[in-house]
Structures are given as structure tokens and as C-alpha cells.
Amino acid sequence: MGAAHSASEEVRELEGKTGFSSDQIEQLHRRFKQLSGDQPTIRKENFNNVPDLELNPIRSKIVRAFFDNRNLRKGPSGLADEINFEDFLTIMSYFRPIDTTMDEEQVELSRKEKLRFLFHMYDSDSDGRITLEEYRNVVEELLSGNPHIEKESARSIADGAMMEAASVCMGQMEPDQVYEGITFEDFLKIWQGIDIETKMHVRFLNMETMALCH
């Protein structure tokens, strides 16, 4: 997919589906070919050669997100064995900065899509709810690179954060009331007022976020 094909129907369709310009699609295609070894699809093992991911404590969750059928809009659960370039673009579109030409409704929709992507990273069993155990796993992985924080401390941090989430989402709970986990609606409440744009970037693919701006 070179410059000669930049105006092709295929590229125009991808522009419409992902919001990327033809130049951005060409740039992402070059990165896709690097990752895939010039093959038509990418498998999980292709991400083993990404230096910026090697030391990332949630590397496995980031890679898994690329193959999650929910993120690929191919179903409510399950993982794909491999992804093609259009799938790759679909995932990368979650990281695309909000366009300044968007109206308020479009901005809110884009923000919700980004948060849904993050929610799926936590909700590993695809049941639509982030349980305490799932939350603990993420926190423990995030803190695993810190030699000063033991596993029990990480669990305590996760437990405290989950209690705070319950407070935000349910208000004052009865002593015998059990908080079963964070739904996506709860997740939206927790992230209300937080700048999601600064939390999602693509540096692990050796591509600066600004390169994906219009």
C-alpha cells in the first residue's frame, strides 16, 4: 500500500471506518509490516520484538487487547489468533487523539470508546464487570516492577481502590451489602473529569502520538 494506492477505494473505506487520514494509514501500514515481518497478519508473538513493551508491567494485557474480539468489534468475548491490517487500524483508532473539529456529542462518543477499551483490559473474563480479583491482578502487575512494594501491599492498594470505587458508584453501603464489581457505567463515573487523552498513547509502537494528529 504505497503512495500510488493512497486514493484507492480501500483507503477511503479505512478513512471512514477509523478516522485516520490516508497519510496516517500509510504510516501505520509501514509499522504493521515491520511488526508482521512483511506478512498479511500479526500474531501475539510478533509483539515480542517491541523494545518499549519488554519492561512494561502490563505488557500481556496490552498485547491481549489487540486480539480481544470486543475491541475488534467482532463479538462479546474471545480472542483472535491473528489480526490483519484493518483490525490493527481498528485498535489503533482507540488511541487517536480527539479531533478539534468534533462536536460535543462526537467528543463524548470518542471518550466513551477509549474508556471501553480500557475497561476491557481490566475485565479479563468478558462478563461486563471488573471484580476485585481482576482489579487486584492489574494493580499487582502495575506494581510488580517496584522492588519496594510487596504483593500484600499491592493487594491492599487494590482493595482500597475497589472500596473507593464502590463508594463513588453506590454511595453509602449497608454493612452486609456486597459490591460485586465495577460495571462499565461505574467505570465511566470513576473516570469522570479525568483527561483520558494523556493516559492513552502509542509510544510502545515507536510512534509518537502527535504523528497521529491531523
Swiss-Prot record:
Positions with a binding annotation for Ca(2+): D123, D125, D127, R129, E134
Induction or repression: Up-regulated during granulocytic differentiation in a ERK-dependent manner (is mediated by activation of ERK) (at protein level). Up-regulated during the differentiation and maturation of primary megakaryocytes. Down-regulated during monocytic-macrophage differentiation in a ERK-dependent manner.
Disordered: region residues: 1-20
Locations listed in the record: Nucleus; Cytoplasm; Membrane; Cell membrane
Membrane association type: Lipid-anchor
Gene Ontology CC terms, in alphabetical order: cytoplasm; cytosol; lamellipodium; nucleoplasm; nucleus; plasma membrane; ruffle; ruffle membrane
Tissue: Expressed in mature megakaryocytes and polymorphonuclear granulocytes (at protein level). Abundantly expressed in heart. Also expressed at a lower level in adult testis and salivary gland, and in the placenta.
Record flagged with keyword Lipoprotein: yes
Gene3D superfamilies: EF-hand
Chief place where the protein resides: nucleus
EF-hand domain location: 110-145
Gene Ontology annotations of biological process type: cellular response to retinoic acid; male gonad development; megakaryocyte differentiation; negative regulation of cell population proliferation; positive regulation of DNA-templated transcription; positive regulation of gene expression; positive regulation of granulocyte differentiation; positive regulation of megakaryocyte differentiation
SUPFAM superfamilies in the cross-refs: EF-hand
Lipid addition sites, N-myristoyl glycine: G2
Entry GO MF terms: calcium ion binding; magnesium ion binding; phosphatase inhibitor activity; protein homodimerization activity; protein kinase inhibitor activity
Composition-biased stretches (Basic and acidic residues): 7-16
UniProt keyword terms in alphabetical order: Calcium, Cell membrane, Cell projection, Cytoplasm, Differentiation, Disulfide bond, Lipoprotein, Membrane, Metal-binding, Myristate, Nucleus, Protein kinase inhibitor, Protein transport, Transport
The protein's assembly and partners: Monomer. Homodimer; disulfide-linked. Interacts with SLC9A1/NHE1; the interaction enables an optimal Na(+)/H(+) exchange activity.
Family the entry assigns: Belongs to the calcineurin regulatory subunit family. CHP subfamily.
Function field: Functions as an integral cofactor in cell pH regulation by controlling plasma membrane-type Na(+)/H(+) exchange activity. Promotes the maturation, transport, cell surface stability and exchange activity of SLC9A1/NHE1 at the plasma membrane. Promotes the induction of hematopoietic stem cell differentiation toward megakaryocytic lineage. Essential for the coupling of ERK cascade activation with the expression of ETS family genes in megakaryocytic differentiation. Also involved in granulocytic differentiation in a ERK-dependent manner. Inhibits the phosphatase activity of calcineurin.
Free-text domain note: Binds calcium via its EF-hands. Calcium-binding mediates a conformational change. Can also bind magnesium.
PANTHER family in the cross-refs: CALCINEURIN B HOMOLOGOUS PROTEIN 3
Protein name: Calcineurin B homologous protein 3
UniProt source species: Homo sapiens
